[in-house]
């Protein structure tokens, strides 16, 4: 692959980092003499190599960036701030290094990293400590920030961030516990019903956790929604199905005292934690909540790992898409998630507890059990033991930290965020149990899921509350799930401490989640309890402080029933009794809460009516954007319309509304584009994605909501990365069937800048010249200089060709910048690279500072990762070029992945043949055809066009 690869044998046990550090504005930072000696060396060796930096201005704090020359078995980094002579570690978890970035932890890949210190000032001194998988550390020379010119990628730094920011770390864990449930039903309503709902004015009610919600008439009006004059006609939908609600009165007009209540359910998918409910003012009576508890003959509604696509094509169609609506446990705003749920699995009173203590169950592999687990965790609710009067029930609590992004693990559509790193330092974390029933028969069950990091035999030793449970053994990137039987007497009422320790040196793994199922007393916790009962069981719930208890039966969450429980006073407060249900039913899912307890939605938004599904639609060019950038697309739309194209500018929220029930997911965009391509009266010829994307759509890292227009994260050969072409790859050959271009902007100012370059671009302003840059091929199997010789042979004779070869040009860096500033029609780079650098010749900071004004080239990059635009903290070269304020490029073609040069070169030769053919060709058409010249599926999927696919450069 055209990235800096170094022999594993030569690099074993060797790690060196050349570090760039950034503050709000940029400068070269010099080591602070003697500081390390004053502070102490730690257990590692201080690096004597100078640290170079380009630093940027943010609204508050210091933005630190550094780059490594190469890495071998690098676990990662710690970053320290030196304040008042004290060294303070800023990161709660190691900042993941090369072992998390590639399949081979000793492959020598150079990497880029960053951290945002909101408490930093120009006086703060920083130290970077590298840590290898054997626990050896090296503290690099300390640096003090200086100020330079601002950068576009820092324009949108959040003014208030709860957690530190780092390239692949999600920040500190928040240890708040909360009770949740996730019974999202399998049944999905008619897509026609959903299309009818979103084609009219509606109030979108956003729900992040399960609970009893209230929306008032003043809240409706404040969001811009007119609820109409008849409260009885308010109708609520989610997933295309009507939901029963309770209103403040049955019929008549609404006033400021009126409200609507309903049982809402949150969401937990890799892309979203927010479910959407749609409230409309209908012309008929809406579905209302009944007042009696009931049982259901189908008590286990659950959503499996994948759902069918929201629309279907005739059987003769080749394409049938699956909408991957991964419904898991709903999350709150905390990164650390301690989940409490109950289990439908009725425990046998005759179960025997293991007298010897914990008994491990054999591990399961993640691939073989991922689908099952996703379904299982939806229906593991409270269950009472088989008796007429339930003495206790089975409750499950889960802890799932999301701290580390592991891009090298190839696990399909499962998210690549994990928890604590288990390496040379043991990991301690707690999991909270409420009111364990110590007299219960049978053991508790502890389920642990791990993820291997490096390719060795792993052994992780597990202990609970100081008692060893056993070991989990696995290999490489396996994802074992292992269960231990634990005596209930070993649990504590409150925080239970888990310890994870590596079994041998160099063994590195990550905790995915921990789930503990235990017998729990039928006692309210903070005046509430979520539980399940079999229909033949009754129960008494103790521990309430108020007699006014609302009992909600949400067995069918679309048709919940509510009653006021009969409460009897006792010595501890109040207790309620639940009678037996229908003997023909299996179980009831119940929630007991005070009548005064209501939840507030996460947000209220006015739905903008849309009808993208109609086959009467048509457009040559689609511009899909975020609502904050829609207005900025107008100049580009006007330009193309003036050239005879029909243009449609589409809010991505409308796509979610129509194709994923309002849920944020990239699958909805593909489903929409497939429908447009196959049913619209005029199918689209080009697609522009106006807005950035992020590998962190859930904002675990606290960087901000940056997934404006999502990209698809695919498993390539070496890592997970972005593929925009996936959105229109309808035949699964790796390349787009409709040309796609990305403008990865985050602000209106960035959008105006990038679009103005396209709108004002004229081939007449650009010299008929090409700059071909080649990396030093010495020691590598592929000759980059010869590759550029072949490129040059494909260019017409009237194009002046300039060459910069790093191997023979000692001033290669300066000459690349000078030639770019002079203006070029075409720039081609062939060589090694990383996200923000061409090996030794050019980087993102250089790109931002270019001054070629309107003499803008098309830049083609044949290396690795320059198109890795979906990193929330780093700006790659491709996006830096098109966002450069005083020049840069009008478009760029670069890869988001790791690939080898052969397939790249085949594609680039075909691209130049097309671009300089007898007739001008649109960039998107040229790219689409050029990808057919390579059989390398990774090259096809990961090369991204940054620009307008409908434009031509000559």
Enumerate the language-model features and the residues they cover.
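Sec/Tat signal peptide C-region and signal peptidase I cleavage site
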Residues: 32-35
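Generic N-terminal simple sequence motifs
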Residues: 11, 27-29, 46, 92, ...
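Low-complexity, Ser/Thr/Pro-rich intrinsically disordered linker/stalk segments at domain junctions
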Residues: 37-177, 700
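Bacterial N-terminal signal peptides
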Residues: 17-30
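N-terminal secretory signal peptides that target proteins for export/translocation
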Residues: 1-13
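Generic alpha-helix initiation/capping and coil-helix boundary signal
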Residues: 10-15, 20, 919, 923, ...
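Cysteine-dependent hydrolase recognition
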Residues: 155-954
